[in-house]
């Protein structure tokens, strides 16, 4: 028996990685659902694929590292070692890839009936073929850098998630590998002007021209391939270098990420000898390779938007709340009553109006805010810069370690500083994941405040796609908490105490445990409802199981990973778990304890995850 099994009760928990794969399978099921509009199904297939890409980069990458440094470590939900987890992951992905192939075939057949056609190069009509050839000669061929692999031409670095056309070449009795990348600057698809909705994928065009590119060789096998690399970089060293520029250190780390080891090889098309050669060069095993018929990248689904509206969900435009008056300053309306926005049904515009108005308001003296992820063209950043340029004291805590947004946040930090904002970063060892904005106004009667706290990012794009709550309040206790929070962040103090806000790592998990204990004391009159993106934190899982065993009714609404298994007799009989996957991404976190007059409810930016509860 493993140490994890001896220490933890594994009868009502499951491994987080396998639970995550079950979540991504639910996304795949949306792509297979005939009740979902066809183009939305194709987009769900793209989301499934990009989700899986990130899973391999981060989770499989992390486990690969862990298998080297702590091979005997056992995780506490399934009792598996790193190597056992990797074996189970690689095996579990095989049927998912096969199901994706099947769903893609069905979708392409159904979409073709509506004129949306992924046309193989070999099926192009004569006029279309000439059009594609001309495009290839003018737009793609000059950018190509083909290479053969031999003693004079070493195996190149294959960039993460870049598409390559690879070929097994023969010259006399010698075999060589030939490879050429799809240039980053070319579009993923080439529309066919004579057939609206029809297109050729760029990698298919490149693959067709391999015989001309490697014209002095005989091509024995060929395929479109992609390598997924470990992207799990460690920030600890950068954060520990007190005398160094953190932005420069993060930039250096991002460059290192591009060179990390491969963890997966994908191939579109059967080419066993070519596959074996690539695996040997990449130092991967056969179980780390997947052969499919579906395209390896499906993001082109988001470029096909000028089609029959029946192929999409009905258009949804977030509305300006009817209970707010656009002619009255937001500050005055919030002072009269709290404003709770539930994106994407009401829009983010009232909050943006508050920022814009505050930037120009002579009475506003300061704006303090956290930034984790913002939009590519961010109105939030624009208004913060305008406020600083208008003489306001603007402090922005930018989290440089927001995964895959590190580069963007480095750029935003620089832009904010150049506008006159004071920029600080999250403390060493902890990401700042909280979403809070504090605006201070000087009036005749003294200082007044508006505080915004929310479950999601300050991102106009995702606010139209994700469900999130945003509370705008003039509550003075919450404002005092906001003042204390930013003062503590400025001096690096994580131990601060707060009146209404729960702040990890000091009071969040501890309070949740206490609140669950309160419901346990009420027995079968107790009630707990938790809506979150993930449930992985072992101590909280055990406490919820204890609540179930005391008769407390527990409803968990969990979009993604849920390591707690409901309905286990004598352990979790009174717990239900519901996962919602649909048109909008469920992102809000709501924690509710008790019923009626005893009910306590919290909005949160934190999931029931160890990293959220203890390392943020």
Spans of features found by a protein language model:
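Hydrophobic alpha/beta core scaffold segments
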Residues: 553-557
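Active-site glycine- and acidic-residue-rich loops that bind
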Residues: 538
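N-terminal localization/anchoring segments of enzymes in phospholipid and broader phosphate metabolism
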Residues: 1-528, 546-550, 562-616
């Amino acid at each position: 028996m493993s140490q994890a099994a001896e220490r933890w009760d594994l009868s009502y928990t499951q491994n987080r990685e396998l639970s995550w794969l079950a979540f991504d399978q639910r996304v795949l099921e949306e792509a297979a659902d005939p009740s979902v509009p066809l183009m939305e199904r194709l987009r769900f297939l793209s989301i499934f694929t990009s989700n899986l890409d990130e899973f391999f980069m981060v989770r499989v990458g992390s486990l690969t590292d862990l298998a080297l440094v702590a091979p005997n470590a056992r995780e506490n939900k399934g009792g598996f070692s790193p190597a056992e987890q990797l074996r189970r992951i690689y095996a579990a992905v095989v049927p998912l890839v096969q199901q994706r192939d099947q769903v893609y075939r069905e979708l392409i057949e159904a979409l073709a009936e509506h004129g949306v056609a992924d046309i193989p190069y070999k099926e192009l009509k004569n006029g279309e073929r000439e059009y594609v050839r001309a495009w290839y000669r003018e737009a793609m061929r000059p950018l190509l850098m083909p290479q053969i692999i031999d003693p004079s031409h070493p195996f190149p670095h294959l960039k993460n998630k870049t598409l390559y056309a690879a070929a097994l070449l023969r010259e006399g009795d010698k075999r060589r590998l030939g490879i050429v990348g799809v240039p980053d600057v070319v579009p993923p698809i080439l529309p066919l002007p004579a057939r609206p909705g029809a297109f050729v994928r760029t990698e298919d065009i490149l693959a067709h021209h391999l015989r001309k590119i490697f014209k002095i060789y005989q091509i024995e096998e060929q395929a479109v391939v992609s390598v997924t690399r470990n992207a799990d970089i460690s920030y600890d060293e950068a954060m520990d270098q007190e005398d160094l520029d953190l932005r420069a250190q993060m930039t250096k780390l991002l460059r290192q990420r591009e060179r990390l080891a491969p963890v997966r090889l994908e191939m579109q098309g059967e080419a066993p000898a070519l596959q074996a050669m690539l695996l040997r060069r990449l130092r991967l095993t056969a179980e780390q390779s997947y052969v499919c018929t579906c395209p390896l990248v499906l993001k082109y689904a988001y470029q096909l938007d000028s089609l029959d509206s029946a192929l999409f969900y009905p258009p949804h435009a977030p509305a300006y709340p009817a209970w707010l008056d656009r002619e009255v300053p937001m500050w005055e309306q919030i002072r009269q009553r709290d404003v709770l926005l539930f994106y994407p049904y009401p829009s983010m515009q009232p909050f943006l109006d508050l920022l814009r108005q505050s930037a120009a308001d002579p009475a506003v003296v300061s704006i303090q805010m956290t930034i984790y992820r913002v939009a590519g063209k961010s109105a939030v950043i624009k208004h913060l810069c305008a406020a600083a340029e208008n003489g306001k004291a603007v402090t922005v805590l930018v989290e440089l370690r927001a995964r895959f947004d590190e580069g963007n946040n480095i750029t935003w930090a620089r832009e904010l500083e150049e506008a006159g904002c004071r920029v600080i970063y999250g403390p060493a060892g902890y990401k700042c994941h909280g979403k809070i904005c504090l605006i201070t106004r000087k009036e005749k009667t003294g200082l007044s405040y508006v505080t915004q706290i929310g479950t999601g990012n300050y991102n106009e794009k995702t606010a139209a796609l994700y469900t999130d709550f945003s509370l705008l309040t003039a509550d003075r206790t919450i404002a005092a908490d906001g003042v204390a929070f930013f003062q503590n962040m400025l001096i690096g103090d994580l131990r601060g105490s707060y009146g209404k806000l729960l702040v990890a790592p000091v009071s969040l998990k501890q309070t949740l445990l206490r609140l669950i204990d309160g419901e346990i004391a009420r027995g079968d009159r107790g009630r707990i409802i938790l809506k979150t993106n993930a449930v992985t934190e072992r101590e909280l899982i055990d406490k919820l199981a204890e609540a179930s065993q005391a008769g407390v009714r527990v409803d968990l609404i969990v979009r993604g990973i849920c390591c707690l298994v409901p309905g286990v007799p004598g352990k979790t009989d009174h717990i239900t778990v519901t996962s919602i996957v649909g048109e909008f991404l469920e992102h809000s976190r709501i924690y509710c304890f008790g019923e009626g007059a005893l009910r306590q409810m919290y909005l949160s930016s934190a999931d029931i995850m160890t990293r959220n509860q203890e390392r943020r």
